[in-house]
Amino acid sequence: MSHDANTIDQRSHEGNLNKLGFWVFLTAEFSLFGTLFATLLTLQHGGDYAGKMTTELFELPLVLIMTFALLISSYTCGIAIYYMRKEKEKLMLIWMIITVLLGMVFVGFEIYEFAHYVHEGVNLTIGSYWSSFFILLGTHGAHVSLGIVWIICLLIQVAMRGLNKDNAPKLFIVSLYWHFLDVVWIFIFTAVYMIGMVFSG
């Protein structure tokens, strides 16, 4: 194991530049989700619900399962990065695989949730509130799915080439991306579901 004072994800100049670039990318992501949130919160008060009230449709147990899956995945991702910086490749791989599995649980339940709403006659086109709802959650879900694919690709690289100063910064960057999506979900859980379960229109 190297005794370099820097952790493995800090030993590549290119990797450090990529981290800086990713922070710039995240500001654009904040703007995107900020716009989607502002639209939904505006339509939450006075938007067209087409007679389909959130107080009747939202199911707390389902939302809690999704929330716990994503929040726990953030914790497991953090553990994976801890072991990455200790250069313990196998433990990093194990915890990242757990992160991916929890992410898949989240996406699976979100697909089930959307299918349930469609079965109840709710879709993207029936009212302005529901349009903003599906766009916000669909955008977040697509980002989570992208994150899962991204992590899997990096894990394949590590499995083939070993953990090194080139792929370690990428793992750190994807962990930032994953934590960002967890933060976005906390806002969704609070602003969309918690408010939606007690108020419609």
Swiss-Prot record:
InterPro entries referenced in this protein's UniProt entry, alphabetically: Cyt_c/ubiquinol_Oxase_su3, Cyt_c_oxidase-like_su3, Cyt_c_oxidase_su3-like_sf, Cyt_c_oxidase_su3_a-hlx, QoxC, Ubiquinol_oxase_su3_dom
GO cellular component, one term: plasma membrane
SUPFAM superfamilies: Cytochrome c oxidase subunit III-like
Cited Pfam families: COX3
Keyword field: Cell membrane, Membrane, Oxidoreductase, Transmembrane, Transmembrane helix
Role of this protein: Catalyzes quinol oxidation with the concomitant reduction of oxygen to water.
Protein name: Probable quinol oxidase subunit 3
UniProt lineage: Bacteria, Bacillati, Bacillota, Bacilli, Bacillales
